[in-house]
Each structure stands twice: as C-alpha cells, then as structure tokens.
C-alpha cells in the first residue's frame, strides 16, 4: 500500500492557481498526495491526468480515486512521453502541470526494489520494472571510467575514483549482486573521516546509479520543455526537485524561457519567436516550512519552482 507523505502539498497545487473546470496533469502520481488535493479543487467539468511508471501506484490510485469517474485518468508511462500520451487522449493543451521528482517513499521502503541503502536487496533501482537496464547492469558491466563519470556528475561524489576502483577490483572475482555488498564497497572507498560527515556514505553513489538507470536528468529536461509547450497561456508549471542537478535544469529552463535574448538595438517590435514564453511566479525556490521538516525528514532537500505561460 502506498503510504506516502507528500512534500510541499498545498504550495505545489495552490501554486498552479487551479481553475475548477480546468484540465491538469500530475506527471508523478506516486502515492497520490498531490492528485488527491488537486482533485478536491475541481468541479465536474475539471479533470486530472496522472502519469506513473509504477503499476502498483496506478492500481492504488484507481481504487483510491474511483469516485471521481472520468475526471481522473491514469497513464502508465514515463513522463518523457507527456506530449504523445496527452495527444492520444485528444488533449492538445492543459491548464497546469506538476512534477514531484522525489522517489516515492513506498519505492524507497520496498526493499526488493533496490533503491535504499538501508536494506540489503537485489540491485535494481528501476522506476519502470519493465525497463531493461538495472543497477546490477550498471555496477557490474559499466567501465571504471563510466562509473567515475556518473558518480561525479550525478552524485557529486568527491571520492568517485576510489569507489569505482573498489567496485572494479571486487567484480573481477565475483558479481556485485546486492545493495548491501555495494554499500560496503562504497564505505571502503571513502576515507574514514569523510564517512562520518554528510549523511549516509552511500547516499551520493546510490543517487547517481538511480539517475543513470532511469536516465532521469535527460528525461526531466525533455519533459519540462514539453510541459511548457502543452500549458495554455495563463496556465502554470510547478516543479519540486530534490537535488541540485534537477534544480539547475529547472532553474535554467525557466530562466531561458522567461527572458528575451539579446536583440539588435532599435527593433520596432520584438518578433514573436523571441518573446518570453514564461513569467516566473517564484524568483527563488519555495522551501518546506520548519513544521513540515519536523513531520517529514525526507522533505529537507525539496525545492519548489513555479512558472506561468504568457
């Protein structure tokens, strides 16, 4: 069962400036927290389309929101196919779109999914369990250079080379099969003083592998551009990120789409293709309140950014 504490619930949904008869998209259904609150704001003419790659999340939401009938539509798909899937439903524009980019707590708390460094489990980490690439493949098949690159780029791990060396040496004799084995190798690769600071020593490498397995950054960048195109003028996009890499993509995409490029001086009018598509609703990200942080430790790295289509 999905018992998931939703982060920045009211801020994210209220930030969409809900029109009761509008059409909205939740790109990250998960435990259905944002969807539940959003549906409660809609009248009979309104509808919500919710995306998730996880079959359990989809089935859970169908049961939970069955009373909404045709107002609630689920799509089992990666949100990288946002435009295509909406067009298949005959939808060409919407009033608002939200993304919550955190791994949902049920995925973290289900040991066999392999997302958590707190449980010993098979190395999996796939959001979509039908996808071919697993964490096992990355850890056992990717070269030393590839591992260093993802640990450094996606995990911002200072000891990327040392950890990759430990993995490379170990797998010469035996495949690395579980999260527990991987955690021990990561610990061995990090000097003892550094192991005692900055949270769990495996946190950054696990993040990096998860991002690589699910191609998360590229997928998000493409989907955010699609969302900006799909939203009507006056409609909004709300995005919750949980690490600096995602936040950087969101910030730069919103900024690029909300500023006018340098044009030759003296132009009588700005051509349409150079006019900004967006207006920033949040100049700086909205952060969880102290009360929310006390209730939900997983909210501590969350940042919310909102933009409106011009």
Curated annotation (Swiss-Prot):
Does S-adenosyl-L-methionine count among this protein's keywords? yes
Q: Which GO terms describe its molecular function?
A: rRNA (cytosine-N4-)-methyltransferase activity
Q: Give EC number(s), comma-separated.
A: 2.1.1.199
InterPro entries per UniProt: RsmH, SAM-dep_MeTrfase_MraW_recog, SAM-dependent_MTases_sf
Keyword line:
Cytoplasm, Methyltransferase, rRNA processing, S-adenosyl-L-methionine, Transferase
Give the catalytic activity.
Answer: cytidine(1402) in 16S rRNA + S-adenosyl-L-methionine = N(4)-methylcytidine(1402) in 16S rRNA + S-adenosyl-L-homocysteine + H(+)
- Domain of life here? Bacteria
Q: Which residues bind S-adenosyl-L-methionine?
A: 32-34, 52, 79, 100, 107
An annotated GO BP: rRNA base methylation
What compartments host this protein?
A: Cytoplasm
Q: Which GO terms describe its cellular component?
A: cytoplasm
The UniProt similarity line reads: Belongs to the methyltransferase superfamily. RsmH family.
The family database entries (PANTHER family) matched by this protein are listed as: 12S RRNA N4-METHYLCYTIDINE METHYLTRANSFERASE (PTHR11265:SF0), S-ADENOSYL-METHYLTRANSFERASE MRAW (PTHR11265)
Q: What does the UniProt function comment say about this protein? A: Specifically methylates the N4 position of cytidine in position 1402 (C1402) of 16S rRNA.
Name of the protein described by the UniProt record: Ribosomal RNA small subunit methyltransferase H
